[in-house]
Amino acid sequence: MTAMVMTACTGQKAEKVEATQDNFNYVVDQFADLQILRYRVPGFESLSLKQKQLLYHLSEAALMGRDILFDQNCRYNLPIRRALEAVYTGYKGDRTDPQFVALETYLKRVWFANGIHHHYAEDKFVPGFTPEFFQTCISQVGASALPLREGQTVEQFVAEISPVIFDPAVMAKRTVQSGDVDLIRASANNYYGEGVTQVEVEDFYARMKAGKDTISPISYGLNSRLVKENGKLVEKVWKVGGLYSSAIEKIVSELQKATAFAENDAQKSIIGKLIEYYQSGDLKIFDAYSILWVEDTASDVDFVNGFIETYGDPLGMKASWESTVNFINKEATKRTKVISDNAQWFEDHSPVDKLYSSAASDVYKRQGFAAIMVRNPLRSRISLRHMTKLLREMVLMMNLSGAIRSAKD
């Protein structure tokens, strides 16, 4: 919005535009240990209408997946968030009451972190309001505004979620990755069903991988929740017609609309392959989509949408849903290219010991890599971590480069 206002004022005096820039307020809000910032989007107005329409539908697709991540982080995240939102919008009391202010801060933290655990430390938030105040607030909210299960009363709902909010021992950490414990049972995340143990998960996927392709394997378990049904482990795949179908159908709908505004055939193929993957849940199609995505260095608009990173799973198998949408800032790219072209000069004049110099290699001459980093800093670390074949080739290239440097030394 600010970018559009500034562009509309280009006919006015430069000092007025400069004043507008100086008065731009980057800080939206500040609470707990967080400061919420907003930024200008330079270059947006220079995009074509078609590119803006593409960005719009890709951004809408990103918004459609929000609740998937909430649910993946903890099975109580959505019920708690919706209950807090109902209280926040319907509260009739004094909004300056310290108890309500604390509840508001807690809700904001939940919004920011996509759940009741800290976005970085992953420890559960400590509410600054009391269980009694929370119960009073809930009692003032109509049952129709609460996320009650069929047949569940308001009292039963409060009794179920209160320990999750207030008891520090219940679901204390989103992802437990160390210690002499069952990592699955100790973690609060929702990638595995109740009663599923770490040993069972490891055995399940070991059997699934046995005798399969080891050169270019798929990312087993990447897009599914492992649950027990009648005592048997079953994968519930995240796809159209599967788990999270309602949200994924909306994502697919926006991606289909975006296809009409693709910048080129390659980008159209990328979006089409992603749609095919969402509809089938086939991880081989995900690999094909990922390869197409990595190969596209011509499009100005870029995006990530899907189950990508596995940091949320203590076993590093299940992927959390995420989406980013971006486009090339061509002026910033020119500046970055100047730095990249002169990277060797910066290294030569840095205080780093020459022992660690890369002068013997051609690392700064690989313009493709520089272009990738300029396009989207996330590109090199998103997607590739799950494509074993590409990772293996990349590691091989790094090892060869290191060997060449060692030989020259």
Model features per residue range: what roles?
Residues D287-K330, K334:
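Active-site-proximal, well-structured secondary-structure segments within enzyme catalytic domains
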Residues A360-Q367:
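Conserved small/polar residues in nucleotide/adenosyl-binding loops
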Residues A19-I218, L222-K236, V240-A260:
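N-terminal helix-rich structural modules
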Residues T10-Q12:
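Bacterial signal peptide processing site
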Residues V5-A8:
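C-terminal motif of bacterial Sec signal peptides marking the signal peptidase cleavage site
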Residues D29, I36, R385-D409:
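Active-site scaffold of zinc-dependent metalloenzymes
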Residues I251-L255, Q267-I275:
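Segments forming glycine/polar-rich beta-alpha architectures that bind adenosine-containing cofactors
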